[in-house]
Amino acid sequence: NVRACIELSVRGTPRNREEMQRQLMKLSSDLSMDFSFQLDNMYRRMRRLICFDMDSTLIETEVIDELAIRAGVGDQVKAITERAMRGEIDFNESFKERVALLKGLDVSVMEDIAHNLPITEGVERLMYVLKKYGYKIAILSGGFTYFGNYLKDKFGLDYVYANELEIEDGKLTGRHVGEIVDGKRKAELLKLIAQVEKVDIAQTI
């Protein structure tokens, strides 16, 4: 199972940049590859802040699915996720509905899942290299702070912003605490961290 990264430098001005990107993204999906489009300027070689998603990125699972299975509501949570994927409900509504189904789950289950998270191949080495070169590293996730903080401690990361599950008497209440971290909130948090670290937004990944 070989993984590789290839950099292609293209000169000139595309006749239709958006169409070129669409075609490459289709190829990305067909071949299970990732593409990143970057302007070849001074900032490209001077990145200082890198932000990661967590579920199915740093870890090879969706934590809410793992929690749902342990709570005996796996099928119900999956059905809500599918409704959201079809656009029938938005992320925030689907998030609240799924979290509500976790009510009563013992916090010890979260601890067990955290200590057995399947870390994506190469992540440990990547974090070591990024820290060695002085990058600030953040997790911005629609997942849960409990697991984000576990990874923060494990790899020595700088920031974690995710959703906090409310816990009372050692059990989940089926509610969350604070603002939901969705796509819009992630963009706001990226800008916030960049300001705190005095990093130009062009120097972020």
Say what each PLM segment does.
Residues M25, D65-I69, Y128:
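A broadly conserved amphipathic alpha-helix scaffold signal in soluble, globular proteins
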Residues N1-F52:
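Non-catalytic pre-domain segments flanking phosphatase-related domains
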Residues M42-N92, K96-E97:
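Active-site neighborhood of HAD-like aspartate-dependent phosphohydrolases
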Residues E88-V109, I113:
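Cysteine/selenocysteine-centered motifs that mediate thiol-based redox chemistry or coordinate metal-sulfur cofactors
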Residues R22, G104-I205:
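C-terminal cap/substrate-recognition subdomain and adjoining C-terminal extension
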Residues P14, E18, L58-T61, G74, ...:
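Electropositive phosphate-/nucleotide-binding environments in soluble metabolic enzymes
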